[in-house]
Amino acid sequence: MSKPSQASQPLAVQPVYLAASAINSVIHALPAGTAYGIGVVLITMFTGQLVHHQGSLARAALPYVWQLRWGWHRVERAMERGKVVLDVLFDRAFTWCFECLPAEPVRLGSEQRTVHAIDSSTVVRLRANKKRCALLGKGYCQRAQRAVQANIVAALTTVVLIRGIRVGLVRRTRFGATCQEAVANVFAALPASPEKRLFCVDAGIATIEQFRIATEHDALVGRLRKNVTLRRSPAPKLSGKRGRPALHGPVVHPGVKRPEGRPDEDTTVRLEDREVRVRRWHNLHFRETPRTRIDVVRVDDPAYNRPLLMGTTARELTTAEIRIAYSHRWPVETNFYVAQGTCAMEMPRAWSATGVERRISLALLAGALLKTIAAACAPLPMGPWDLKAVSSAGRLANHLSLHAQNFATLALHGLTPRKYRKINIAKKPAELQLPLAA
């Protein structure tokens, strides 16, 4: 008696094919020699081998280029001298995610604004020579608890949903001597978009200057300092009263224990087993920018010692939407963690401006792609002990390292490394006059 056939199961998305397709589509527009080298770099980052070799690109790339003459040197040369425009790579990766993955942009408010997050990270370079290493600045190191010399990078991330999982797609990276300079460079290099946008930032980035340059098209929402001082709108000028109309109204300190006056909204929200008080003030402004109106939301949660202050220029958002918008800031920090732990962002091993910029930017790009591909695939357990596996970038990198050869073959499909040959030009001997015989 024949055994009954098993019920057909839905085919799962193969992460190896997705990751290989992502790399192939990103690098296919580059020149042939450069594309092969950059592809090998991305493969070492996707598989976590660059972290395993402590950031040594030559050792990590050697298994993929051993058959080539000067193989690892070609990879290093592509990173230092290849014709690569990072913004083009970011745009191609962004397009690939929407074409090949079930990605949907997060939208908020009646204006249906797309949500973007901006944050900065400090890549510590304690042993780097100041004269030799480029793009060095000063940044605070949490581990050392002091300011150290470092490469400071700021990243712009677009927040999307993939199968209900919130992830961030890196769109731009910029560097600077300080965090403020790097963030300002990111704001100056924003990609053009016909849709209205909402940028989520943290307290160090939500400065008065950033609120001032925010527009109706590109609004800003960010956390404010606890000691921030704001002004209410002035009372309307009475008819017949002499003098100019007032620019500022009463002073408001929304972060103190008892703010002045009454808020425009005062509600209580039930979260799990506790009640959270939420207050909102309309049409406030900084003393330095009286024409820039913002709404401020204060959240008093019993689980935290300090209140959470959020300000936004998108005043059409409801109080609940402002709280949701600020929570969308976390994907950009997740990209930094993935790039550090899986793609060796903290170990650039580069000293020129081009090398530092490409090593750190490609690590952020690889980390974001790992996170998005993992969200689109089924959970990948590390072993029989991993009973509660989740869709994470680290598990995906471990899976790709187990299939590294097949993954590299698919990722570099259609790309042929440039063949170098030594050109021997026979030099003609100089026709010198023979010396006269004695």
Label each residue range with its predicted role.
Residues 1-40, 48-49, 64, 163-175, ...:
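A short, flexible helix-boundary coil/loop motif
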